[in-house]
């Protein structure tokens, strides 16, 4: 039996690059789609948010001279591109899914509402939420927190390239140690880079647990759903 009934899966755009420096790696995309299919077949209701950093990042764009609002809007469009790619990959292996956008852009995707999303998930469709919150100055992590809270998810699963939360960046500090679980309060007091401050505070205020794990290891998503402790749980 699955550990959670309804999840919000957050994937980073950068992870879709695989070993490339830009864009979408077809093999990585297929790996993700197969993992999502495994969990969907367990009867889990799945909502997904994907970042757009493999294509464009609004904040870095503003640092290069772009207007911040325009830059963030470009970033929102990047998340739509990634969402369409994942939708196509899921459809290719028989997973029914729906792309919902925070900004109206039919026929690319349907305009998001909580009720539309829940109805689709209860009918067995995977919902992919794109275009962030539809507003500038909000990260896709914050968008993930918002969507997770709105759809009444049991947990936000944050798929990353590391196997949890550490005292420091394990890719830079070999002495960093991993937390099996940690409170929202400690994440904030330690200044750990799990998600941005707004996203963490939203989860804390609405009691949405966060589970950070390595999505790049094939099979890990199913392991999380089966109850294996392979990441870090953030909770009250």
Question: What do the predicted segments below correspond to?
Answer:
Residues 1-236:
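C-terminal catalytic "cap/lid" subdomain
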């Amino acid at each position: 039996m699955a550990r959670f009934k309804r999840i919000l899966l957050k994937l980073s755009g950068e992870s879709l690059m695989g070993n490339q420096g830009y864009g979408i790696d077809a093999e990585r995309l297929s790996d993700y789609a197969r993992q999502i299919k495994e969990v969907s077949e367990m009867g889990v209701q799945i909502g997904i948010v994907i970042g757009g950093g493999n294509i464009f990042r609004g904040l870095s764009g503003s640092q290069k001279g772009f207007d911040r609002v325009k830059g963030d809007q470009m970033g929102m469009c990047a998340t739509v591109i990634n969402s369409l790619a994942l939708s196509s990959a899921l459809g290719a292996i028989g997973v029914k899914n729906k792309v919902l956008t925070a900004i109206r852009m039919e026929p690319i995707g349907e305009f998001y509402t909580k009720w539309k999303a829940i109805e689709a998930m209860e009918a067995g469709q995977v919902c992919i939420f794109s275009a962030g919150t539809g507003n500038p100055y909000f990260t896709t992590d914050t968008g993930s927190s918002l969507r997770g809270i709105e759809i009444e998810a049991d947990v936000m699963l944050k798929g990353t390239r590391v196997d949890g939360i550490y005292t420091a960046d394990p890719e830079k500090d070999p002495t960093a140690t991993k937390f099996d679980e940690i409170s929202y309060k400690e994440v904030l007091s330690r200044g750990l880079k799990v998600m941005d401050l707004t996203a963490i505070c939203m989860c804390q205020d609405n009691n949405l647990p966060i589970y950070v794990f390595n999505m790049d290891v094939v099979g890990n998503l199913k392991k999380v759903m089966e109850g294996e402790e392979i990441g870090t749980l953030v909770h009250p």
